[in-house]
Amino acid sequence: MDQENERNISRLWRAFRTVKEMVKDRGYFITQEEVELPLEDFKAKYCDSMGRPQRKMMSFQANPTEESISKFPDMGSLWVEFCDEPSVGVKTMKTFVIHIQEKNFQTGIFVYQNNITPSAMKLVPSIPPATIETFNEAALVVNITHHELVPKHIRLSSDEKRELLKRYRLKESQLPRIQRADPVALYLGLKRGEVVKIIRKSETSGRYASYRICM
């Protein structure tokens, strides 16, 4: 196997690990063994006899943990798909959207290699209450939430949000904002109106929390 292919497989393996971590961090059941799948095992499982990755085989379903269901009753199951095609057109995206609809997934995560055509992107917001999210493989090679400068973000439930606003006598409009396009908001799958608790380290007080609403 040539070095270029080895590098590409290594990057894909790291992107796969980030997706597993992301799904786990959202409150879905993913084992630590799945997250820590060694590179050699990844190759054996997801590459053909010529050493070429078979992205379609990397797709998986995840279900919420019991703790997540108690906090987020509408969470539902999730489907992740890695696309074999370098460029994604309407036909491929339509097949993905129909799969999410027919199998009653609450969330569909579509991981693509190079680009998605504008026409295909128009299908993304087309199936409420289900949500379709798209991620570029290259953006997943490194898990941004593991960077030392990125503080811990925790999504609040509706009850926790209500309690927060009541405790501090705030209106939603008074909370600082986090944009839906923010990398951490995308990582957590935040929706408009949801609140995150952000825990930062402080030299004087150990740790302190702030809150932002997704807009």
Swiss-Prot record:
Transmembrane segments: none annotated. InterPro entries: Arch_Rpo5/euc_Rpb5, RNA_pol_Rpb5_N, RNA_pol_Rpb5_N_sf, RNA_pol_subH/Rpb5_C, RNA_pol_subH/Rpb5_CS, RPB5-like_sf. It is found in: Nucleus. One of its GO terms (biological process) is transcription initiation at RNA polymerase II promoter. The keyword Acyltransferase does not apply. GO terms for molecular function: DNA binding; DNA-directed RNA polymerase activity. Keywords: DNA-binding, DNA-directed RNA polymerase, Nucleus, Ribosome biogenesis, Transcription. GO terms for cellular component: nucleoplasm; nucleus; RNA polymerase I complex; RNA polymerase II, core complex; RNA polymerase III complex. DNA-dependent RNA polymerases catalyze the transcription of DNA into RNA using the four ribonucleoside triphosphates as substrates. Common component of RNA polymerases I, II and III which synthesize ribosomal RNA precursors, mRNA precursors and many functional non-coding RNAs, and small RNAs, such as 5S rRNA and tRNAs, respectively. Pol II is the central component of the basal RNA polymerase II transcription machinery. RNA polymerase complexes are composed of mobile elements that move relative to each other. Belongs to the archaeal Rpo5/eukaryotic RPB5 RNA polymerase subunit family. PANTHER family: DNA-DIRECTED RNA POLYMERASES I, II, AND III SUBUNIT RPABC1. Component of the RNA polymerase I (Pol I), RNA polymerase II (Pol II) and RNA polymerase III (Pol III) complexes. Component of the RNA polymerase I (Pol I) complex consisting of 14 subunits: RPA135, RPA190, RPC40, RPA14, RPB5, RPO26, RPA43, RPB8, RPA12, RPB10, RPC19, RPC10, RPA49 and RPA34. The complex is composed of a horseshoe-shaped core containing ten subunits (RPA135, RPA190, RPB5, RPO26, RPB8, RPB10, RPC10, RPA12, RPC19 and RPC40) where RPA135 and RPA190 form the DNA-binding cleft. This is DNA-directed RNA polymerases I, II, and III subunit RPABC1. The gene is RPB5.
